[in-house]
Amino acid sequence: MALFVAEHRHTAEHCPAGNPQMAPFLLQILSPENAAKAGLTLHGDAVARGQHHLYVIVEGPNEAAVRQYLGAFAQTGTLDVIPASSCEEVVGRGAC
């Protein structure tokens, strides 16, 4: 499994948290149990307060699988899926 950081950005006008139909659906996507059914492991998520940026740390077989699973977030803005490493791995190899 590979590690990824997914970043979703949207405008205040398209904030899914304020959409009563979309918000519960997006929370289901961020459920560790639902991600596991898709073969992914969610390590955490955070929203930068007031910035309309969501960050998700996720392990998956490849970038395409992560992008497909989190694809609903792209409906309200952008979705970037970036290959990542843990700090321990970076220090172990001596470079980012």
Predicted regions and their residues:
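A common structural junction motif
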Residues: 73-81
